[in-house]
Curated annotation (Swiss-Prot):
This is NADH-quinone oxidoreductase subunit H. The gene is nuoH. It comes from Geobacillus thermodenitrificans (strain NG80-2). The lineage of its organism: Bacteria, Bacillati, Bacillota, Bacilli, Bacillales. It holds the Pfam family NADHdh. PROSITE patterns: COMPLEX1_ND1_2 (PS00668). Its main location: membrane. The chain crosses the membrane at residues 16-36, 87-107, 116-136, 164-184, 190-210, 231-251, 253-273, 277-297, 312-332. NDH-1 shuttles electrons from NADH, via FMN and iron-sulfur (Fe-S) centers, to quinones in the respiratory chain. The immediate electron acceptor for the enzyme in this species is believed to be ubiquinone. Couples the redox reaction to proton translocation (for every two electrons transferred, four hydrogen ions are translocated across the cytoplasmic membrane), and thus conserves the redox energy in a proton gradient. This subunit may bind ubiquinone. NCBIfam families: PRK06076.1-2.
Length: 332
């Protein structure tokens, strides 16, 4: 598809490109809608409850749709003491990078928007921009809880971005490329979760922290910060922050599938099943584990969060790079 889009420019290509972008947005919005429902159902099951069961039948299939409609009808309030331009701009800054990173993710061997030579670097660089929107929203709200939540988000991103990147370096060393398609191709014989188990563990933990998910949801800690950086937001502006969070859940689950679970490569002897199905199954498994974390683990303290990143994950990621370099030089 990307070869066709890169051919001679024309209005047809432009229209198709934006049409495919709109289609991807609809797919992601559908994922967000039912990821929220799945999260509520799974947590309800783990807590001995039924979960949503009224709107849209006994399974509550339209509960999230009803919640979104209710959210959009809420009053859009702006605090009197807020910095209005930045307050309005912050949700857009937070959401836009979350959708931009999807362009670099190959979902199958044939379906990808851009075959970027440094796709992994692109993802890491662009995803970090969301923190600017979070900090801006916290500061512009002129609220001490919002500001503290924004500063926590910045500190957490800086701390966990380093081990996340360094753990991904082991994958880059084995694949010999930062192109995500090449990384999937390099896992034709063995998935990198088996060749790089330590890197997978570090990357997964750092990814949970990057997503601000339990047990690392310090920027939004309800019991400490009254919802954190978006405490002063309501209506559709608050929805932008929530949407960014779940779009990143979509993107990070896809990235973990690409880097460590072989992407669309099948399990041995089951090659007759399409690659897109395998990608979806691995993707759903990662999303389920992230939901399971929320229903299982308590929130860690802020000091424990920082110490774990700098004193545990960072040294382990350095050890993994050295071991990978030695193994690469001796056996490959």
């Amino acid at each position: 598809m990307e070869q066709w889009l890169e051919s001679a420019p024309g209005w047809t290509n432009v229209a198709v490109f934006f049409g495919l972008g709109a289609l991807l947005l609809l797919v992601v919005l559908g994922f967000v809608t039912y990821a929220i429902l799945a999260e509520r159902k799974v947590m309800g099951f783990m807590q001995g409850r039924i979960g949503p069961n009224q709107v849209g039948g006994r399974l509550g299939l339209l509960q999230t749709v009803a919640d979104v409609l209710k959210l959009l009808l809420k009053e859009d309030t702006i605090p009197k003491a807020a910095d209005r331009p930045l307050y309005v701009l912050a949700p857009i800054i937070a959401f836009t990078p979350s959708f931009m990173v999807l362009a670099a993710l190959p979902f199958t061997d044939a379906f990808r928007f851009a075959d970027i030579g440094v796709g992994l670097l692109y993802y890491i660089a662009v995803s970090g921009l969301t923190t600017i929107g979070v900090v801006t929203g916290g500061w512009a709200s002129n609220n001490k809880y919002a500001l503290l939540g924004g500063m926590r988000a910045a500190a957490q991103m800086i701390s966990y971005e380093i081990p996340l990147v360094m753990s991904a370096l082991g994958v880059v060393l084995l694949a010999g490329s930062m192109n995500l398609v090449d990384i999937v191709t390099a896992q034709d014989n063995v998935w990198f979760i088996f060749a790089q188990p330590l890197a997978f563990l570090i990357f997964f933990i750092a990814a949970v922290a990057e997503l601000n998910r339990v047990p690392f949801d310090l920027p939004e800690a309800e019991s400490e910060l009254v919802s954190g950086f978006h405490v002063e937001y309501s209506g559709f502006r608050w929805a932008f922050f929530m949407l960014a969070e779940y779009v990143y859940l979509f993107a990070m689950a896809a990235l973990i599938t690409i880097l460590f679970l072989g992407g669309w490569h099948p399990v041995a002897f089951l090659g007759w099943i399409p690659g897109s199905v395998w990608f979806a199954l691995k993707f759903c498994a990662i999303v389920y584990v992230l939901i399971w974390f929320r229903a299982t683990f308590p929130r860690v303290r802020a000091d424990q969060l920082m110490e774990f990143a700098w004193k545990v994950l960072l040294p382990l990621s350095l050890v993994n790079i050295v071991l990978t370099a030695v193994i690469k030089s001796l056996f490959f």
